[in-house]
Each structure stands twice: as C-alpha cells, then as structure tokens.
A protein has these predicted regions:
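Eukaryotic intrinsically disordered, low-complexity regulatory tails and linkers enriched
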Residues: 149-164
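N-terminal secretory signal peptides
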Residues: 21-62
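Sec/Tat signal peptide C-region and signal peptidase I cleavage site
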Residues: 14-20
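Sec-dependent N-terminal signal peptides
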Residues: 4-14
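Intrinsically disordered, low-complexity segments enriched in glycine/proline and serine/threonine
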Residues: 5-6, 132, 156-159
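Extended alpha-helical scaffolding segments
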Residues: 45-46, 50, 54-145
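Extended hydrophobic/Leu-rich segments
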Residues: 10, 24, 39, 91-95, ...
Length: 164
C-alpha cells in the first residue's frame, strides 16, 4: 500500500516539476511578448499566464505587469479576476507579485483608491485583500505621499583617514 501511495504522489508531482523546469526558448519569449501585447481582458491575461508563465522575466515580465495594471486601473469585470484568483492560488500569488512590481508603482495608488472606494457588489473580500496588498506605506507597495520624498538617500561624507 505504501508503494502505491508513493507512486501516486510521484505521478502527481511530476507535472508540477516539469512546469517548474520548463525553459523559455527564444520562440516562446517572442510568442509570449505577442500574447502579452494582445491582452485586453482578464480572460486573455489568465490564458497568457497559463501559456507563458515560464517566460515571466525581463520584457515579458514588464509586459505582464503593464497589462495587469492596465486592466486593474480600468476596473471592469472584476468578477473574472476575482474568480480566477480564488480557484488558483499560484495565479493569485503571481497577480500579487505583479501588482507589487516596481513597474506597477505608478498605478498602485489608483488601484488602492478603487479597491477602497469603488468596489463592485459581491466583491468586498476581493477588494479588501487587493487594498491590503497595494496599501501605501507597506513594504513593496506604493509609497505614502509626502513632501520631500526622494528616490535615494543623500550621500553622507566619508571621514578623512587619520594621517597622524
């Protein structure tokens, strides 16, 4: 019985391992970029993710983030993204990764405001979670607006070596 359970566990884990090790060929990267450029709906986004998540790096990563944030700021048909994230924890993690991406920083405050003030009926849990993820002031989230915010800390003088 233990052998059957072990074999079953291995058989179930094999497809996951194969996905994790899939290499993004040059052809895959080109196809992924084309697919990402055509994303106009939550369904397109989810399909592109399923087809090309193994290519989610470099320009494809930025393209995915741009497409996701464009849809988020458009704030339409949220039931589709909410349902997709509810049924697939890996997809949900991927969405959260992209909304926290540095490439998404310019849109995070808008998404936060939409989630807090314009939540569609029956999407309260989705909006609350999304607002918490992109909440300004949270590490990785949109910075809290304040006067004098700078991207870098000012340089501090280096003490002169003691020559005595």
């Amino acid at each position: 019985m233990k052998k059957i359970a072990t074999l079953l566990a291995c058989a179930l884990a094999l497809p996951l391992a194969a996905h994790a090790q899939k290499v993004c060929s040059a052809a895959d990267a080109t196809a992924a970029q084309k697919a990402v450029d055509k994303i106009v709906s939550w369904q397109n986004l989810e399909k592109a993710w399923h087809d090309y998540r193994h290519c989610d790096k470099d320009t494809v990563d930025d393209g995915f983030t741009d497409a996701l944030m464009r849809l988020m700021v458009g704030w339409k048909n949220l039931d589709a993204i909410s349902a997709a994230m509810a049924r697939d924890a890996e997809y949900k993690k991927w969405v959260h990764k992209h909304v926290l991406s540095p490439a998404a920083k310019d849109d995070r405050e808008d998404v936060y405001a939409l989630a807090k003030k314009s939540c569609p009926a029956k999407q309260d849990a989705f909006c609350a979670e999304l607002a918490e993820v992109v909440k300004p002031g949270k590490p990785g989230a949109a910075p809290a607006a304040a006067s004098g915010d700078t991207l870098f800390e000012p340089l501090k003088p280096i003490p002169a070596p003691n020559t005595k």
